[in-house]
């Protein structure tokens, strides 16, 4: 294979000319020496995105292009970007091209996989449906997660998406003991650092591989880092027959990075300035996240909602792929109820008596009915006051306010902020607690006793303390 020469540099995009008949294929990795990144030769990787004609390809750089000059030599590696996979990646932080960035030495593994891989064949996919317990009351009761499913955490800025993800990692590592892969896509470097330190302190780091392409990285890295992390997860699923958890924070940044490079690649923007290939790119990523006969990948994806607008093309395209949605609401966060999950807006495909059993389904529907009735009555209460309600409606409002407070829960990962020890609530306890509230067994208990409690027994202890 002959080497090429740089003919043009436009921000994160570089054009490279090769000799006739020597063009690298789409997605092949090219390497070039960038003195601004260090003295090592071939230290910048770029991925071929387009063939422009006249023996020229356009490639997206995975790191800074500052310092590149026209006429510089470019190496065709003859293969795609490949990342190390296997147990050697656990406890490590990798970047988009699979290099360790935690200063802990090289990754101890001999196997590397290319990051663009085919979707599992239809015959290899599993069709079994079962719920996946998280230990978080509002999730397990009202919008349960499916094993091997795709879950979206929707919310604007600062309502608690990252904290909820960290709590899930904590609960799953402690209770489930499986491997997790965390993809930090275009989020804050500080959060990435905090996550690593907290995982280390809570002893879950040795079960987790972290792959980061943070906010300060060029769009090429942010657009590909989710694929690198998914490849690490696929190895555990296909070769080690594991049930893997893949956390993506934040899937919106994957779309955003794609839109940043799309215009530079000469594509005409689509609605709201997004790339015309938005649904294709999203589909290629999401379809690889699935359960096969070997194992499963359950993915939890934080989805930033620009300006709290759920109809924006980025969140709307992601919706189509999800099995469950956990919607975080600013109104609920303002009430001081955390996790700020909206119990009426969040949904799940498996909220079905045939999957969960009749009792769980009935309690969930009863809780939703009480909360919806309270929501309907709020206009009347605001205009006329509580006194104008019928006795039955007053009772509904009282129960709804207790349910609302009982849906809050202290998190393990937030102990350092709140000083309250975190609680993992078993599903059977969650169902029992809400069933008793809906049936009116705790109508005499003050609503403040339900706030930030674990199970219903703790609520009764709180009430006894308040009474004494």
Swiss-Prot record:
Catalytic activity: ATP + H2O + 4 H(+)(in) = ADP + phosphate + 5 H(+)(out)
Membrane topology according to the record: Peripheral membrane protein
Main subcellular location: membrane
Enzyme type, top EC level: translocase
One function term, GO molecular function aspect: proton-transporting ATP synthase activity, rotational mechanism
Residues the record lists as binding ATP: 155-162
Gene Ontology CC annotation, any one: proton-transporting ATP synthase complex
Domain of life according to the entry: Bacteria
CDD domains, per the entry: ATP-synt_F1_beta_C, ATP-synt_F1_beta_N, F1-ATPase_beta_CD
Record key words, sorted: ATP synthesis, ATP-binding, Cell inner membrane, Cell membrane, CF(1), Hydrogen ion transport, Ion transport, Membrane, Nucleotide-binding, Translocase, Transport
EC number: 7.1.2.2
Annotated function: Produces ATP from ADP in the presence of a proton gradient across the membrane. The catalytic sites are hosted primarily by the beta subunits.
The protein's assembly and partners: F-type ATPases have 2 components, CF(1) - the catalytic core - and CF(0) - the membrane proton channel. CF(1) has five subunits: alpha(3), beta(3), gamma(1), delta(1), epsilon(1). CF(0) has three main subunits: a(1), b(2) and c(9-12). The alpha and beta chains form an alternating ring which encloses part of the gamma chain. CF(1) is attached to CF(0) by a central stalk formed by the gamma and epsilon chains, while a peripheral stalk is formed by the delta and b chains.
Protein name stated in the entry: ATP synthase subunit beta 3
Native source species: Syntrophotalea carbinolica (strain DSM 2380 / NBRC 103641 / GraBd1)
Organism phylogeny: Bacteria, Pseudomonadati, Thermodesulfobacteriota, Desulfuromonadia, Desulfuromonadales
């Amino acid at each position: 294979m002959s080497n090429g020469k740089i003919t043009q540099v436009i921000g994160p995009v570089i054009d490279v000319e090769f000799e006739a008949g020597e063009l690298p294929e789409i997605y092949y990795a090219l390497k070039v020496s960038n003195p601004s990144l260090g003295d090592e030769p071939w230290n910048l990787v770029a991925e071929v995105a387009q063939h422009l004609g006249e023996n020229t390809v356009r490639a997206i750089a995975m790191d800074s292009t500052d310092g590149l000059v026209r006429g510089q030599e470019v190496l065709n590696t003859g293969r795609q970007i490949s990342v190390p996979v296997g147990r050697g990646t656990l406890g490590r932080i990798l970047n988009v091209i699979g290099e360790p960035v935690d200063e802990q030495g090289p990754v101890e593994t001999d196997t590397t996989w290319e990051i663009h891989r085919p979707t599992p064949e239809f015959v290899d996919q599993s069709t079994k449906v079962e719920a996946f317990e998280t230990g978080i009351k509002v999730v397990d009761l009202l919008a349960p997660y499916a094993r091997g499913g795709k879950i979206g955490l929707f919310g604007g800025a600062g309502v608690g998406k990252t904290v909820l993800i960290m709590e899930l990692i904590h609960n799953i590592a402690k209770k489930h003991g499986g491997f997790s892969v965390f993809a930090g896509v275009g989020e804050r470097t500080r959060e990435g650092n905090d996550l690593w330190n907290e995982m280390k302190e809570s002893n879950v780091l040795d079960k987790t591989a972290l792959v980061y392409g943070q906010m300060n990285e060029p769009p090429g890295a942010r657009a590909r880092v989710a694929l690198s992390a998914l490849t690490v997860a696929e190895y555990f699923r296909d070769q080690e027959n594991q049930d893997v958890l893949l956390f993506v924070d934040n899937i919106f940044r994957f779309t955003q990075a794609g839109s940043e490079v799309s215009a530079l690649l000469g594509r005409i923007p689509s609605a709201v300035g997004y790339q015309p290939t938005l649904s294709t790119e999203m589909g290629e990523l999401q379809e690889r996240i699935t359960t096969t006969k070997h194992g499963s990948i359950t993915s939890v994806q934080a989805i930033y909602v620009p300006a709290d607008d759920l109809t924006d093309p980025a969140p709307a395209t992601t919706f189509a792929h999800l099995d469950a949605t956990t919607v975080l609401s600013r109104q609920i966060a303002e009430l001081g109820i955390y996790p700020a999950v909206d119990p009426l807006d969040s949904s799940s495909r498996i909220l079905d008596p045939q999957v969960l059993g009749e009792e769980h389904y009935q309690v969930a529907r009863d809780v939703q009915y009480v909360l919806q009735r309270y929501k309907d009555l709020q206009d009347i209460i605001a205009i006329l006051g509580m006194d104008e309600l019928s006795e039955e409606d007053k009772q509904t409002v009282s129960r709804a306010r207790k349910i609302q407070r009982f849906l809050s829960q202290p998190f393990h990962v937030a102990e350092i902020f709140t000083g309250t020890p975190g609680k993992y609530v078993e599903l059977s306890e969650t169902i029992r607690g809400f069933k008793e509230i809906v049936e009116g067994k705790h109508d005499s208990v003050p609503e403040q006793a339900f706030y930030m409690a674990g199970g219903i027994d703790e609520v009764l202890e709180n009430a006894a303390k308040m009474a004494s």
